[in-house]
């Protein structure tokens, strides 16, 4: 007769209890906690829903990672677990063994089932398993904390699936006892009114990222104000109303409802991203005024900035401490860039990355920016591709970068003299001009990584090299 280890005997005993349906809450109270994960897995795979209901009531761990066990949501399993929780929540005096504080329906903690069950668990002594316990394994003292139910909420359909619908109804009737928590909320298809009702169910402090992409008016942002104002831990907000209009704000922030305006008061943002906002002229000034503290990053893409909009950039304190400024595909050939120069002057001590890409900046406009640019002593990356500048203008630009010793990556356009009628680079012309530009630059400082012309190279596909003297196609 072969000898079985104590842990193996416990496993067999648990399987026998499940098969013969002898499981009771009193028996569970006497079982060692090492047996629970494997028994729970067995009960789940065999669809023993009554056993699941009982095991939840005696669950000896802080967290039950049900989502990583189910993989695909299963309504009857979820119902059994929630019914077990109902029995617990209805008791004024909680059971001696109850430690469960989090029901996790996300697929994020598969290690739990690996550690506490199967070969790994059977190979560990009870002493070794007990060392896995941390301070969090022990119940907190004091008042009962609400049970937390964590989910992933990525709504790609216009209606809720049956599991989420059931869970939301269950949460609704247990307010104060249970918090529905979701770190990241995404809505791609659900109508605005239905989505607002769904947000009412989610514990607002748990939301760290909120992403809404739906075809509706930018002005409807105000309808989310009452919910956004409660999300004290929100760090990223992405709003895309319509196919082209996008507003992205990143950082820890607090919202103050203001239903009379399309934007909200943003107190602690770190990043503002605006892309293809067709009516930005009506909103940019107000948006910058709503930013109560300085931004770290400002990204503005695919739009037209009128003189009035450009003036806004230099007037508001929210842009006074930028580390990154990205203006991409902003048509500027008729725009007065003096306000942009004033902004660069203001952020000269903090700016590390400057992108002026595909803005069609002309020679006369570039000259306006040079005095301020030369003072950006912290600049590490300068991206200036896609602008219409001559060789002389580029030489002047390079001379003004002499004091920018931290520049590690520079990308410049091919001078106008190197372009044919279709705007394509003539590499034979570019090669000697590039040599002139490099000579001009080396007179004021030694560059690190630098590139002139389109990238990647249309002939060889190369990108900016780690070395200055990279291969240049002929």
From Swiss-Prot:
A biological process term (GO) from this entry: negative regulation of cell differentiation
GO CC term, one of those recorded: Cul2-RING ubiquitin ligase complex
UniProt entry tagged with the keyword Repeat: yes
Keywords, ordered alphabetically: Leucine-rich repeat, Repeat
Protein name as it appears in the record: PRAME family member 17
The encoding gene: PRAMEF17
A Gene Ontology molecular function term of the record: ubiquitin-like ligase-substrate adaptor activity
Alphabetized SUPFAM superfamilies for the sequence: RNI-like
Keyword presence, Translocase: no
Family statement: Belongs to the PRAME family.
Alphabetical list of InterPro entries matching this protein: LRR_dom_sf (IPR032675), PRAME (IPR026271), PRAME_domain (IPR050694)
Organism of this sequence: Homo sapiens (Human)
Residue stretches of each LRR repeat: 97-124, 179-203, 204-230, 231-265, 266-291, 292-323, 324-342, 348-375, 376-400
């Amino acid at each position: 007769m072969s000898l079985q280890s104590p842990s193996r005997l416990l496993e067999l005993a648990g399987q026998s209890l499940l098969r013969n349906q002898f499981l009771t809450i009193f028996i569970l109270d006497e079982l060692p906690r090492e047996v629970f994960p494997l028994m729970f897995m067995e009960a789940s795979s065999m669809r023993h829903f009554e056993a699941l209901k009982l095991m939840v009531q005696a669950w000896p761990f802080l967290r039950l990672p049900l989502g990583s066990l189910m993989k695909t949501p299963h309504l009857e399993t979820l119902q059994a677990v929630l019914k077990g929780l109902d029995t617990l929540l209805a008791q004024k005096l909680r059971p001696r063994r109850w430690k469960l504080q989090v029901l996790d329906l996300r697929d994020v903690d598969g290690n739990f089932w690996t550690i506490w069950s199967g070969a790994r668990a059977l190979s560990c002594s009870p002493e070794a398993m007990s060392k896995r316990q941390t301070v969090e394994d022990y119940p907190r003292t004091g008042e009962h904390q609400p049970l937390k139910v964590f989910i992933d909420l990525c709504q790609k359909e216009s209606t809720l699936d049956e599991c989420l619908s059931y869970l939301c109804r269950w949460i609704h009737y247990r307010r104060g006892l249970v918090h529905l928590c979701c770190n990241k909320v995404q809505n791609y298809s659900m109508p605005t009114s239905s989505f607002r009702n769904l947000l009412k169910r989610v514990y607002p402090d748990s939301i760290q990222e909120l992403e809404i992409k739906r075809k509706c008016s930018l002005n409807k942002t105000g309808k989310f104000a009452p919910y956004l104002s409660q999300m004290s831990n929100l760090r990223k907000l992405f709003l895309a109303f319509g196919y082209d209009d996008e507003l992205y704000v990143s950082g820890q922030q607090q919202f103050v409802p203001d239903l009379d305006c399309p934007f909200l008061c943003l107190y602690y943002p770190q990043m503002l991203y605006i892309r293809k906002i067709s009516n930005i002229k009506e909103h940019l000034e107000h948006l910058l005024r709503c930013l109560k503290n300085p931004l770290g990053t400002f990204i503005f893409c695919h739009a037209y900035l009128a003189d009035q909009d450009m003036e806004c950039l230099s007037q508001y304190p929210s842009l006074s401490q930028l580390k990154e400024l990205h203006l991409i595909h902003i048509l500027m050939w008729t725009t007065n860039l003096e306000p942009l120069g004033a902004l660069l002057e203001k952020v000269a001590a903090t700016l590390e990355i400057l992108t002026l890409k595909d803005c069609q900046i002309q020679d006369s406009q570039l000259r306006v920016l040079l005095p301020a640019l030369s003072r950006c002593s912290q600049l590490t990356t300068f991206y200036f591709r896609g602008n219409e500048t001559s060789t002389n203008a580029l030489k002047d630009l390079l001379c003004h970068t002499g004091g920018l010793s931290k520049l590690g990556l520079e990308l410049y356009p091919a001078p106008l003299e190197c372009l044919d009628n279709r705007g394509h680079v003539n590499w034979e012309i570019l090669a000697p001009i590039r040599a002139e530009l490099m000579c001009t630059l080396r007179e004021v400082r030694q560059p690190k990584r630098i590139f002139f012309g389109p990238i990647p190279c249309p002939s060889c596909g190369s990108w900016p090299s780690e070395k200055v003297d990279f291969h240049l196609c002929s």
